[in-house]
């Protein structure tokens, strides 16, 4: 395990305690910050459950994050929506599973506003929705979680689905990387301070693996 996550001064409490706090926050309709290790992306992602996401929470992701808001989905939802990969041959460093970007066909204006993006996400996760309910391209970026979860890929994408399942929520989440005001990526301990300031518990991907989450 990378030292920054093994060190209790970095992330207070045990892995189980951190996971429990994150799960409780999601169940209450609030967000969490998920961090990976410095040998991977070394980033913290702000994550919310797709089914409880509000326009205010979306605004926070746009304002405090990279602006690239991603909707994490599993195979059944992506197949229902007939969303193909963004590219035929994925050569990205971490094999991130981007599909084509989407927009709700109804109920949005330009699709860029926080409210419009929430409308798009709600349309996508509606079990009754089909490919005809979405326009492509758009301003929401779906990501396909690996079918074998964290056992196959230890990414923020798979961590999002693992957290939703632990919380008893539908397997769909929304994430955006947290950034500093100067445009650089936020790292620990900045992420810890950000989480404390906004009441967002922090959990690491290693924590999720340690408690057996998939």
Swiss-Prot record:
Its cofactor is Mg(2+); Mn(2+). Pathway: Cofactor biosynthesis; riboflavin biosynthesis; 2-hydroxy-3-oxobutyl phosphate from D-ribulose 5-phosphate: step 1/1. The keyword Metal-binding applies. Mg(2+) 1 binds at residue 41. GO terms for biological process: riboflavin biosynthetic process. D-ribulose 5-phosphate binds at residues 40-41, 45, 153-157, 177. Keywords: Lyase, Magnesium, Manganese, Metal-binding, Riboflavin biosynthesis. GO terms for cellular component: cytosol. It catalyses: D-ribulose 5-phosphate = (2S)-2-hydroxy-3-oxobutyl phosphate + formate + H(+). InterPro entries: DHBP_synth_RibB-like_a/b_dom, DHBP_synthase_RibB. Its EC number is 4.1.99.12. One of its GO terms (molecular function) is 3,4-dihydroxy-2-butanone-4-phosphate synthase activity. The keyword Flavoprotein does not apply. SUPFAM superfamilies: YrdC/RibB. Gene3D superfamilies: DHBP synthase. The record marks 139, 177 as: Essential for catalytic activity. Pfam families: DHBP_synthase. Homodimer. Catalyzes the conversion of D-ribulose 5-phosphate to formate and 3,4-dihydroxy-2-butanone 4-phosphate. Belongs to the DHBP synthase family. This is 3,4-dihydroxy-2-butanone 4-phosphate synthase.
């Amino acid at each position: 395990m990378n030292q920054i996550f093994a060190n209790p001064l970095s992330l207070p409490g045990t892995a189980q305690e951190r996971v429990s706090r994150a799960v409780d926050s999601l169940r209450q309709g609030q967000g969490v910050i998920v961090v990976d290790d410095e040998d991977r992306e070394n980033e913290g992602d702000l994550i919310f459950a797709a089914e409880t996401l509000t326009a205010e929470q979306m605004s926070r992701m746009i304002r405090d994050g990279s602006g690239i808001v991603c909707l994490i989905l599993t195979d059944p939802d992506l197949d229902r929506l007939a969303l193909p990969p963004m590219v035929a041959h994925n050569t990205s460093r971490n094999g991130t599973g981007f599909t084509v970007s989407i927009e709700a066909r109804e109920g949005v204006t330009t699709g860029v506003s926080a409210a419009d993006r929430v409308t798009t996400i709600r349309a996508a996760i509606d079990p009754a929705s089909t490919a005809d309910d979405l326009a492509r391209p758009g301003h929401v970026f779906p990501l396909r979680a690996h079918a074998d979860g964290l056992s196959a890929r230890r990414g923020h994408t798979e961590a999002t689905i693992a957290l939703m399942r632990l919380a008893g929520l539908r397997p769909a989440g929304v994430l955006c990387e947290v950034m500093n005001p100067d445009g650089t990526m936020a790292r620990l301990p900045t992420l810890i301070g950000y989480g404390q300031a906004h009441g967002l518990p922090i959990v690491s991907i290693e924590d999720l693996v340690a408690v057996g989450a998939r």
